[in-house]
Amino acid sequence: MANVHQENEEMEQPLQNGQEDRPVGGGEGHQPAANNNNNNHNHNHNHHRRGQARRLAPNFRWAIPNRQMNDGLGGDGDDMEMFMEEMREIRRKLRELQLRNCLRILMGELSNHHDHHDEFCLMP
């Protein structure tokens, strides 16, 4: 009978010291707390924050761009080829516009009353 009484005292001791009842092994977000009452309020608050942060972490999947999500499917080569083709097309159009502008300046197609000092020509 003395053993049963001693076990009950050991189980109630953390509650008498002002500590909260926690699962054995620490559980999620466990931090050891001191026995004084001043640290218990901060411990409880931090425990809640840690649990909240862990619950929110899986919700960040929406922030991953689709290109990265599809990388595992073997579509990298196609995406890169499409990107390179777009870059070649942009460069071609840019060279065409620059050449057209330079030809207009050099051939004097602009009206004579315009001042050409502020214009420039980039030769490809």
UniProtKB/Swiss-Prot annotation:
<protein>
    <recommendedName>
        <fullName>Protein BEX3</fullName>
    </recommendedName>
</protein>
<dbReference type="GO" id="GO:0005829">
    <property type="term" value="C:cytosol"/>
</dbReference>
<comment type="subunit">
    <text>Self-associates. Binds to the DEATH domain of p75NTR/NGFR. Interacts with 14-3-3 epsilon (YWHAE). Interacts with DIABLO/SMAC.</text>
</comment>
<feature type="region of interest" description="Interaction with 14-3-3 epsilon">
    <location>
        <begin position="81"/>
        <end position="124"/>
    </location>
</feature>
<keyword id="KW-0963">Cytoplasm</keyword>
<feature type="region of interest" description="Interaction with p75NTR/NGFR">
    <location>
        <begin position="81"/>
        <end position="106"/>
    </location>
</feature>
<dbReference type="GO" id="GO:0005123">
    <property type="term" value="F:death receptor binding"/>
</dbReference>
<feature type="short sequence motif" description="Nuclear export signal">
    <location>
        <begin position="90"/>
        <end position="100"/>
    </location>
</feature>
<feature type="compositionally biased region" description="Basic residues">
    <location>
        <begin position="42"/>
        <end position="53"/>
    </location>
</feature>
<dbReference type="GO" id="GO:0042802">
    <property type="term" value="F:identical protein binding"/>
</dbReference>
<feature type="region of interest" description="Disordered">
    <location>
        <begin position="1"/>
        <end position="56"/>
    </location>
</feature>
<dbReference type="InterPro" id="IPR007623">
    <property type="entry name" value="BEX"/>
</dbReference>
<dbReference type="InterPro" id="IPR021156">
    <property type="entry name" value="TF_A-like/BEX"/>
</dbReference>
<dbReference type="GO" id="GO:0005163">
    <property type="term" value="F:nerve growth factor receptor binding"/>
</dbReference>
<dbReference type="GO" id="GO:0008625">
    <property type="term" value="P:extrinsic apoptotic signaling pathway via death domain receptors"/>
</dbReference>
<dbReference type="GO" id="GO:0046872">
    <property type="term" value="F:metal ion binding"/>
</dbReference>
<dbReference type="GO" id="GO:0140678">
    <property type="term" value="F:molecular function inhibitor activity"/>
</dbReference>
<dbReference type="GO" id="GO:0005737">
    <property type="term" value="C:cytoplasm"/>
</dbReference>
<feature type="binding site">
    <location>
        <position position="121"/>
    </location>
    <ligand>
        <name>Zn(2+)</name>
    </ligand>
</feature>
<keyword id="KW-0832">Ubl conjugation</keyword>
<keyword id="KW-0479">Metal-binding</keyword>
<comment type="similarity">
    <text>Belongs to the BEX family.</text>
</comment>
<dbReference type="Pfam" id="PF04538">
    <property type="entry name" value="BEX"/>
</dbReference>
<keyword id="KW-0053">Apoptosis</keyword>
<keyword id="KW-0539">Nucleus</keyword>
<keyword id="KW-0862">Zinc</keyword>
<dbReference type="GO" id="GO:0031397">
    <property type="term" value="P:negative regulation of protein ubiquitination"/>
</dbReference>
<dbReference type="GO" id="GO:0005634">
    <property type="term" value="C:nucleus"/>
</dbReference>
<feature type="region of interest" description="His cluster">
    <location>
        <begin position="113"/>
        <end position="117"/>
    </location>
</feature>
<comment type="function">
    <text>May be a signaling adapter molecule involved in NGFR/p75NTR-mediated apoptosis induced by NGF. Plays a role in zinc-triggered neuronal death. In absence of reductive stress, acts as a pseudosubstrate for the CRL2(FEM1B) complex: associates with FEM1B via zinc, thereby preventing association between FEM1B and its substrates.</text>
</comment>
